[in-house]
Amino acid sequence: MNIRKEIKLNRELKLYIMRHGETEWNMLEKFQGQLNSALTERGIEKIVKTGKELENVKFKAVYTSELGRTIDTAEIILENNNFEKKKDVEKRLKLEKLSELNEIYFGEWQGMDFKEIFLKYPEEAHNYFYDVKNYCAENVKGEELKDGLERFLSGLKKIVNDNEEGNILIVTHGAVLELFFNYIESKEADDFDERNLIGNGEYRIFTYKNGKYVMETFEKKL
């Protein structure tokens, strides 16, 4: 193995992967998917708290989806980062927006609340929440979960290929993150459970080394 290839295989990145803050539609239990909704005051407060936890992390790059709730979340994190505060405005990190980091496209469900979905699509709604192996996104003109996962993984691949080392902040969405968490545990896309999504404004840290994503031991801060 040549030296350059060996260095590339042994490189180590830290990925701080975060779900956006709570939005108005989160609070109303509406499917957002690839539509957007504004952050709530409670959502902003949580992001600021998370920003304080990460205030002494020197980020090399910041990636978000194309949706406003992730962009707004990332901007608040950077506003509370001590390294960014010291920089001249023009030298501060710029957000890199990737469509691959977008949320699952939920088709006809987007903008509808959970109760409405169960009334209009009782069988598919039941399958999505309680029997996802039988969920068929095509029936609601949406994106299949496995396709959304592959899209998200392609976005992560871009990120790790563009960054040799350092700390990277990635702000994305609940459903694609749940799919990713299952993926690194060697679970299938149809092991997805909407009820287990990471909380709004919360994050997990992954080390990327030798082509693998490894979640660091995570202790919940009280």
What are these regions (language model features)?
Residues 10, 49-126:
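Phosphate-coordination/substrate-recognition cap region in phosphate-metabolizing enzymes
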Residues 10-16:
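Extreme N-terminal starter segment of soluble prokaryotic enzymes
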Residues 15, 165-171:
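Residue-level preference for the first positions of well-ordered beta-strands
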Residues 22-72, 140-152:
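Loop-to-helix element that buttresses phosphate recognition and phosphoryl-transfer chemistry
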Residues 56-58, 159-167:
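Glycine-rich phosphate-binding loop signature in dinucleotide/nucleotide-binding domains
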Residues 125-147:
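Short glycine/proline- and acidic residue-enriched helix-loop micro-motifs
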Residues 174-178, 202:
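GST superfamily/GST-like fold recognition
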Residues 187-214:
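Domain-level recognition of soluble alpha/beta enzyme cores
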